[in-house]
A protein has these predicted regions:
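Short polybasic/polar patches that bind polyanions
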Residues: 22, 209, 232
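Residue-level signal for nonpolar/aromatic packing positions in well-ordered secondary structure
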Residues: 62, 99, 177, 198, ...
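GST-like domain detector, emphasizing the conserved glutathione-binding G-site
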Residues: 1-144, 183, 257-258, 264-266
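Short, hydrophobic secondary-structure boundary micro-motifs
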Residues: 86-91, 113-114, 189-191, 217, ...
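Short, solvent-exposed turn/loop segments enriched in Gly/Ser/Thr/Pro and often Arg
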Residues: 39, 196, 243-244
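GST-like fold's C-terminal all-alpha helical module
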Residues: 110-228
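Long, positively charged, glycine-interspersed low-complexity recognition regions
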Residues: 218-266
Length: 266
């Protein structure tokens, strides 16, 4: 069995797949699976050879014995079926359906929301300061799945209302996690079993913490305990290796949420 992963260290969607690989007993890059680091700063995800594998022009892209799988959540579910033990989804059909509903929510809400402060804090000022409107538009036109996102952001980055809305969506996510832990008996989101849901939620929460927005969940005790338990797992340490966070990857450009609040008032 040959597993290859085309990924980026600090990409939240790449991190979801690395967490799943680690939980399936394949934690080591370059040993348990073949690593292909995609440099998003050089737009390697838009090179013809990459687009042949993944026409969406995003990371990650997964290969299993030469067969290509794209989209991080689809890759996670593929790994669950290809490597059934340890199980990361409930066996009960109703519980499994509820787990998939969670995966849909996590894809549509926090995974999307976290991009707003990520670009406000780092990517927009790092990539587009000094660029002309034409250069910015040309860049957006190259991105199959992100063009509308860039058009909404504009060259100046996101404003106060956008960041507050994104933080509100992360807060909603944290409240739902906290309630699910209470309803299901914990310690994990669906109860006693650590699942793909816990893995899928982890990168968005880690990104928010890295940017200094962890005050969002400080009053949610079950959520705080869950987060501490997540960070104690070996899979977390294997996934968030040095350089896997924005603050480590781009220290000269990175701004914490607090710095932005002081500079901009939000």
């Amino acid at each position: 069995m040959t597993i290859e992963l085309y990924h980026t260290a600090h990409s939240t969607c790449s991190q979801k797949v690395r967490l799943t690989l680690a939980e399936k007993g394949l934690p080591e890059r370059g040993k348990d699976w073949v690593e292909h680091e995609v440099d998003l700063g050089k737009f390697q995800q838009l090179e013809p050879a990459y687009l042949e594998m993944n026409p969406n022009g995003v990371v990650p892209t997964f290969k299993h014995d030469g067969e290509v799988i794209i989209e991080s959540s689809a890759i996670m579910e593929y790994l669950e079926e290809a490597i059934p033990e340890p199980a990361l989804l409930p066996k009960d059909l109703v519980a499994r359906a509820r787990a998939r509903a969670w995966m849909r929510y996590l894809d549509e809400v926090p995974t999307v929301a976290v991009r707003v402060p990520s670009f406000a804090n780092l990517f927009a000022p790092m990539r587009f300061t000094g660029k002309s409107d034409q250069e910015f538009s040309a860049h957006a036109d190259r991105l199959p799945l992100r063009k509308q996102f860039y058009q909404r952001m504009t060259q100046k980055g996101f404003g106060k209302a956008d960041i507050e809305n994104a933080c509100g969506q992360i807060r909603q996510t944290c409240e739902r996690i906290d309630k699910a832990i209470a309803d299901n008996g914990g310690p994990w989101i669906l109860g006693q079993q650590y699942t793909l849901i816990d893995a899928q939620a982890t990168p968005s929460i880690d990104r928010m913490e890295d940017m200094g927005y962890d005050d969002i969940w400080q009053d949610l005790e079950r959520m705080k305990t869950w987060w501490a338990d997540i960070k104690a797992r070996p899979s977390y340490k294997a996934t968030f290796y040095p350089g896997a966070r924005m603050s480590e990857r781009y220290p000269a450009h990175f701004k914490t949420a607090q710095q932005l609040r002081e500079e901009r008032g939000y």
